[in-house]
């Protein structure tokens, strides 16, 4: 009875063990580790966490939730009672917020604070630096920041204004006064993120009228709240040249951007500000002017800066225009506006403010803002009698400025004489730039041009003019079929003098018309300079990017390359393909018909390819050819009503033309033309070359196997021979001397030639199998001879036989050893074959076919088995060769080590030989001249010293020997004394033994006698 209370007491004091569930969890990212499910209890809810004991942290997965209805013990361990377990598994994959996820902003981020965190949600893993998890709690901190900055008013000198900051209003960070800024679902666009994203910005303003500054930390610099209502003018307008937006009496504009939505405003405003005509496809934010020195003047214009208000005065009966630039919106604007003043619509894309160009040398080519282009599109819809040029918002392939000048429709009688005469009203600067708000375009020439998918409802139809170089290389130029058309008359090829004349006429007309626009305006001089620059750029672009027409000579003996250009822009017209995820390439696969193929640039090969660029200068065609080209142009372009004159004089003459114009315009045009042209061309060429080289690259193993199979069957190697010939032809073409290179250092005529091109050796006009003109003129080497494949082909197994070049010499010993090993292996294989033949597993016919190497007589499975066996034999041979090579390597390493050791010893022995020449010279000097008394005395003294040193050394050695001999002699004497003592002791023991034996014998005799 006394033991029961003790047992009960022991059971009470017994330490309970925690229930642990150990399981093996295999991690995808690393080696397997043991995890333990630990039970953590908060508010009567037990969570089972997986704890990684190897790495010392709790995993994010929480697969089980248990609701506990009973009380938990004081020791923290739940007693096994009836409980309710709620098993809720997280979904397999949740959409997480990916900042760099290709611009897919339509995904939502899981911001719940539940303890069930999906292991796929990696948002909080960036801050996980501790081993043990901590409790999560919410902390709301309201902070109000007030930032006030002062700007020095400098109305005349804006040099230091670029280094100042903008006027920032008071920031109210309170939650109750913030503006709810909702980001709707944005459709997927190009992954390059270089296009404007249509966004529906729904704003609900509270008291204060300021934008929420919460997201400003993700912007570029300190930003000012963009006020959409610009009706209230500021008192200080000193920084209007730099600030955004332009302060004017403008009513609010709806930011809803749709495709077929016409905005109807109830309010009517007297004036129509320039900001209402701008493209506000993305909310323009005000950038800190500290970084303004890195922007070009055109970049400032891109942001909507510097448009004088006195140049834009539109009639008072104008209604607000929808921001959607579509045909419907333009037609609505055209219906509402009955009359426009032509003098008020000129040169809107050029900045009218004095911007400091201190850092202009570091800027990229000037760009005109997309907003100015949209303004010009709106102006274009007003004048029904005049057709202004219109280009698509985004050029697919060429990221450059394309300033296109159109002529005013003239009468039929004056069309030939005044072909290039332009009027002031007709000059429209249409520039195509990439839509990147507030971004410096200095590095734009190094970026790859990206395509934009044009909507089905868009009225702009892109057509591509294809110029094909040598069966393969094509250059696509994007034009607008809707408004930009070729003339009905014949295409005229003008000379350099005509270009100079047209330029002088343009300058005179421009200067006369500029003087008519607001003579009292402050910006009149700037307008004149701007128009001159625009006209010069247009002349340069017309001389650089036009159609080439040259006579195709029929004489077969002529070695001059002939270039045949397309006569119209619509010959190679094609619908824009699916460009949503397409790469930036200038060449798209398309089937060319006979007419298009004949009208593309075809280059015939000459013996000296350096003559190509010298003959590229276009000759004047005959009147008959012009009439033929004109007829084709009339058939292809029925809607054209304007005349155009094009000229092409090559790069050198174009540069000569531009020598008389402003240097800034020349440099800008060259950079914008050639940098973007070479960038897009070279990128597409390099990409095509990589793909072609990858497809043309064949492994030597496959070539040798195919070669051996063909030789076994007694057939010819047509495919391999043609491949080698084409490869040799490509090598010879690449090695041809070419002195005509473009600015990028590449040969334009040879940079896209590939023997694996689908157009090579195939022409629409020639019979199938007929080689091209280029391949006919190339000298090809003779085909390689047929050869029998040995049992172990060196091309297959990459064996380099150690054979000497001279057959009369003996072979290397390594080669002999290796041949013996190979012979032994062959004997083993032959023994296996004989054993198989003895068992009759193979028929005699198949054995004969194997011996004669007639593989085609076998079935497909049997051929596969033979090839597998052959590969196994090759692998076995490679293993044998590797073993032999390793053994020889070890032996050679040992020999090398021995030789190095011997060389080191020889080097030590010959170390003083380098001084023998000096010693020899000294001896000859002593022998030639008799020594003086002093020198002889010195020599005698040195000799005596040397003798004394030698005597001392000998005496020292003798003393050492004597001392050693004395020591040895003393040791010898001691040993002799010790030996004598031992002998004496031994003799005494013998005597004692003999005496004892004598006594013992006497005693024995006495006993016997008794």
UniProtKB/Swiss-Prot annotation:
Transmembrane segments in this chain: where?
none
- Keyword Acyltransferase annotated: no
Q: Coiled coil located at which positions?
A: 820-915, 956-988
- Annotated S-S bridges: none
The places in or outside the cell where this protein is found are: Cytoplasm, Cell cortex; Chromosome, Centromere, Kinetochore
Q: In Gene Ontology terms, what is one molecular function of this protein?
A: protein-containing complex binding
- Keywords tagged on the record: Cell cycle, Cell division, Centromere, Chromosome, Chromosome partition, Coiled coil, Cytoplasm, Kinetochore, Meiosis, Mitosis, Repeat
Region of interest (9 X 4 AA repeats of M-[D/E]-[I/L/M]-[S/T]), residue spans:
85-431
Judging by the UniProt lineage, the source's domain of life is Eukaryota
Keyword Cytoplasm recorded: yes
sequence repeat copies, ranges: 85-88, 109-112, 228-231, 255-258, 278-281, 323-326, 346-349, 402-405, 428-431
Any single biological process term in GO: establishment of protein localization
The entry's free-text remark on domains says:
The N-terminus contains a number of repeats which contribute additively to bub-1 recruitment to unattached kinetochores. The repeats are not required for localization to kinetochores.
Binding partners and assembly = Component of the KNL1 complex composed of knl-1 and kbp-5. Part of the ten-subunit outer kinetochore KMN network that includes the KNL1, MIS12 and NDC80 complexes. Interacts with the protein phosphatase 1 (PP1) catalytic subunit gsp-1; the interaction is direct. Interacts with the protein phosphatase 1 (PP1) catalytic subunit gsp-2; the interaction is direct. Interacts with the MIS12 complex subunits kbp-1, kbp-2 and mis-12. Interacts with the NDC80 complex components ndc-80 and him-10. Interacts with knl-3. Interacts with kbp-3. Interacts with kbp-4. Interacts with kbp-5.
What protein is this chain from? Outer kinetochore KNL1 complex subunit knl-1
From which source organism is this entry? Caenorhabditis elegans
What is the gene name? knl-1
């Amino acid at each position: 009875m006394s033991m029961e209370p003790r047992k009960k007491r022991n059971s009470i004091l017994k330490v309970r063990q925690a229930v642990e569930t150990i399981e093996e969890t295999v991690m995808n990212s690393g080696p397997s580790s043991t995890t333990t499910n630990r039970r953590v209890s908060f508010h009567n809810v037990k969570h089972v966490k997986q704890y990684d004991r190897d790495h010392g942290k709790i995993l994010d997965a929480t697969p089980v939730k248990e609701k506990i209805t009973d009380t938990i013990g004081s020791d923290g361990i739940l007693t096994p009672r009836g409980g309710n377990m709620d098993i809720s598994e997280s979904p397999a994959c949740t959409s997480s917020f990916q900042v760099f996820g290709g611009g897919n902003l339509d995904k939502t981020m899981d911001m719940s604070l539940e303890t069930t965190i999906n292991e796929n949600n990696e948002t909080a893993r960036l801050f996980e630096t501790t081993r043990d998890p901590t409790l999560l709690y919410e902390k709301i901190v309201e902070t109000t920041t007030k930032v006030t900055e002062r700007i020095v008013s400098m109305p005349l000198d804006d040099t230091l204004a670029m280094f100042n900051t903008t006027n920032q209003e008071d920031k109210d960070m309170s939650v109750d006064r913030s503006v709810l800024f909702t980001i709707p679902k944005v459709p997927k666009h190009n992954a390059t993120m270089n296009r404007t994203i249509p966004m529906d910005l729904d704003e609900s303003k509270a008291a204060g009228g300021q934008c929420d500054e919460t997201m400003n930390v993700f912007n570029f610099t300190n930003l000012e709240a963009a006020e959409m209502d610009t009706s209230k003018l500021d008192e200080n307008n000193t920084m209007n040249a730099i600030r955004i937006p332009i302060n004017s009496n403008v009513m609010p504009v709806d930011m809803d951007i749709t495709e077929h939505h016409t905005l109807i405003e109830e309010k009517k405003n007297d004036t129509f500000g320039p900001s209402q005509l701008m493209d506000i496809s993305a909310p323009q934010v005000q950038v800190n002017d500290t970084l303004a020195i890195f922007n070009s003047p055109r970049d400032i214009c891109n942001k909507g800066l510097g448009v004088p208000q006195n140049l834009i005065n539109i009639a008072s009966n104008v209604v607000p225009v929808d921001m959607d630039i579509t045909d419907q919106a333009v037609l609505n604007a055209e219906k509402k506006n009955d009359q426009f003043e032509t003098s008020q619509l000129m040169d809107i894309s050029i900045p009218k403010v004095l911007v400091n160009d201190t850092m202009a040398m570091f800027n990229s080519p000037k760009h005109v803002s997309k907003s100015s282009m949209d303004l010009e599109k709106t102006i274009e819809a007003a004048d029904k009698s005049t057709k202004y040029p219109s280009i698509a918002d985004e050029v697919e392939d060429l990221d450059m400025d394309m300033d296109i000048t159109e002529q005013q429709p003239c009468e039929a009688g004056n069309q030939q004489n005044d072909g290039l005469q332009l009027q002031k009203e007709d000059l429209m600067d249409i520039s195509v730039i990439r839509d990147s708000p507030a971004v410096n375009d200095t590095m734009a020439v190094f970026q790859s041009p990206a395509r934009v998918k044009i909507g089905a409802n868009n009225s702009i139809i892109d057509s591509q003019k294809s110029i094909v170089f040598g069966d393969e290389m094509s250059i696509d130029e994007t034009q607008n079929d809707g408004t930009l058309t070729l003339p009905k008359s014949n295409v005229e090829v003008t000379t350099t003098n005509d270009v100079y004349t047209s330029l002088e006429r343009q300058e005179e007309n421009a200067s006369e018309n500029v003087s008519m626009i607001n003579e009292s305006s402050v910006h009149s001089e700037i307008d004149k300079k701007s128009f001159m620059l625009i006209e010069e750029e247009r002349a340069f672009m017309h001389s650089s990017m036009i159609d080439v027409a040259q006579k195709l000579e029929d004489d077969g003996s002529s070695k001059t390359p002939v270039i045949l250009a397309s006569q119209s822009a619509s010959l190679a017209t094609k619908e824009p393909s699916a460009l949503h995820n397409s790469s930036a390439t200038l060449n798209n696969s398309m089937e060319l018909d006979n007419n298009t193929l004949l009208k593309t640039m075809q280059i015939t090969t000459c013996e000296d390819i350096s003559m190509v660029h010298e003959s590229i200068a276009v000759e004047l065609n005959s009147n008959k050819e012009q009439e033929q080209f004109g007829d084709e142009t009339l058939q292809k372009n029925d809607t054209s009503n304007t005349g155009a004159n094009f000229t092409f004089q090559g790069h050198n003459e174009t540069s000569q033309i531009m020598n008389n114009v402003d240097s800034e315009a020349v440099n800008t045009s060259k950079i914008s033309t050639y940098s973007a042209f070479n960038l897009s061309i070279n990128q597409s060429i390099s990409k095509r070359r990589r793909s072609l080289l990858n497809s043309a690259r064949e492994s030597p193993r496959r070539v040798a196997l195919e070669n051996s199979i063909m030789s076994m069957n007694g057939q010819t190697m047509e495919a391999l021979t043609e491949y080698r010939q084409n490869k040799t032809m490509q090598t010879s073409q690449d090695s041809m001397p070419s002195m005509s290179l473009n600015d990028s250092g590449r040969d334009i005529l040879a940079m896209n030639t590939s023997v694996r091109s689908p157009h090579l050796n195939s022409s629409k006009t020639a019979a199938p199998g007929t080689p091209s003109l280029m391949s006919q003129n190339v000298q090809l080497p003779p085909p390689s001879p047929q050869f029998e494949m040995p049992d172990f082909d060196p091309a297959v197994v990459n064996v380099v036989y150690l054979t000497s070049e001279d057959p009369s010499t003996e072979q290397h010993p390594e080669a002999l050893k290796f041949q013996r090993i190979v012979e032994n292996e062959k004997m083993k294989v032959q023994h296996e074959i004989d054993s198989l033949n003895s068992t009759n597993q193979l028929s005699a016919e198949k054995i004969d076919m194997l011996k004669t190497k007639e593989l085609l007589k076998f079935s497909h499975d049997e051929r596969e088995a033979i090839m597998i066996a052959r590969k196994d034999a090759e692998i076995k041979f490679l293993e044998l060769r590797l073993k032999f090579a390793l053994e020889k390597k070890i032996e050679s390493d040992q020999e090398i080590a021995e030789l190095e050791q011997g060389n080191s010893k020889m080097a030590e022995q010959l170390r003083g030989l380098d001084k023998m020449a000096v010693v020899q010279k000294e001896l000859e000097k002593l022998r030639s001249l008799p020594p003086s008394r002093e020198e002889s005395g010195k020599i005698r003294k040195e000799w005596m010293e040397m003798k004394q040193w030698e005597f001392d050394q000998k005496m020292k050695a003798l003393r050492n020997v004597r001392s050693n001999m004395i020591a040895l002699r003393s040791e010898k004497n001691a040993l002799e004394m010790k030996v004598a003592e031992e002998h004496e002791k031994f003799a005494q023991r013998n005597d004692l033994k003999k005496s004892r034996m004598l006594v013992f014998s006497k005693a024995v005799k006495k006993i016997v006698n008794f």
